[in-house]
Amino acid sequence: MKSWVLGAAGIAGAGVALAVNSRDAGAAASQAWPAFVLVAGLLLVGLVAAEDGLFAAAGAALRRACPNSLVLFCGMAALIMVVSAVLNLDTAVAFLTPVAVSAGGRSTDAGLEEGLEEGRPNVGAALLPACILLSNAGSLLLPGSNLTNLIVVTHARISGGSFASRMFLPWIAVGLVTAGVVAVLSRDSLRAKRDGSPTQLGGESASAEESPGRPRLGVGAVGIGAAVAAMLLLGSPSLVVLAVGVAAVCARMFGARMLGVRAPGGSVKVARVAQVLNLPVLVGLMGLATAVGTLGRLWSGPSELLGHLDPLGTAVAAAVSTVLINNLPAASLLSARAVTHPLALLIGLDVGPNLFVSGSLAWVLWLSSARACGVDPGLRRALRIGVVAAPLGTLAGVAALMLTA
């Protein structure tokens, strides 16, 4: 019900913007739509990859290979960063949160859920906040890693490869700082012994654990490769990535003979596709982005403020704005006019949401994914860590960005 309310609000907002100034509303819509089309394609690719067991198998392999909780945490942190960069932070949060719960397993004292509720040391207490915080931090590398990236750089026509070359060092710096803060503030959990038993979950993750380390290398893997290639090579990859996602889902639904790849494990259900895409939310957010983008074109205040700030000040202003109005409206508002330091703006927009739940919808997705596994993810604990990690990560990211200039 709430998703339909958001959808209606977004459509109404876009309608008001169109009535007030059709030219600016059209410009705002043209800036916003590629981001939402691309994320829809990436969510579809991520869904097929999850159905193929790729994420669950990666988590199971890490659990088997890592000798202790700290090494497991480092491996999961790297996995979260890479999936966020390649398949978008929303995909990472949706499909890796169950993997983090499963990989956390049971401590020698209690099961994961009991350990989290009773405050007992458990590696899951570090993996769960890491999932949301590192998903945000890991969304700096490619234009498609975060909706805000595409909104800000849409008119720049910069290729994914060029964007990645400029943002690689900031991505590494923010990721290392964020992971380090989570590890330090969760050090008791990372000292806990593991018993080698994964937490059993319902649905796809549980089934993947039945044959850990043996993912179905078919349509999902092909889709990931094609989506990554499009984002790296094309200046405007949105429609191509959407086509890849639709083709991947159709291949799983109707068979993959036409593509020359195998699609074992059954077809993707239409209801599951609708659940993952959540079109009312995507349409609503695009409408709101259009409305706020129109406001940014009519009101010169945000542009004038950013014009007087250095890169660090720009990043800080962006981070604060994500807490106040959410990162997507903030991206539309602050980039409606030319920005002096667009990449610094992105660091604030991507890392700032770690400060508070209002920063991005990924927080809501993280909470719902963890609770669907029957686990309370510990929101207050994650926020306490995020309040420390976000400022330090922003500072590290801007410093690394200035080194690449």
Regions found by a protein language model. Name each.
Residues 30, 47, 51-52, 56-59, ...:
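Transmembrane helical segments that form the transport core of multi-pass membrane transport proteins
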Residues 1-3, 24-35, 160-170, 210-214, ...:
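Interfacial loop-to-helix junctions that mark the boundaries of transmembrane helices
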Residues 161-211, 222, 362-405:
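Juxtamembrane and boundary regions of transmembrane helices in multi-pass small-molecule transporters
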Residues 8, 36-37, 70-78, 92, ...:
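Hydrophobic alpha-helical transmembrane segments
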Residues 8-20, 40-46, 80-81, 135-138, ...:
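Hydrophobic core segments of alpha-helical transmembrane domains in multi-pass membrane transport
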Residues 176-264:
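Long, contiguous bundles of hydrophobic transmembrane helices that form the permeation core
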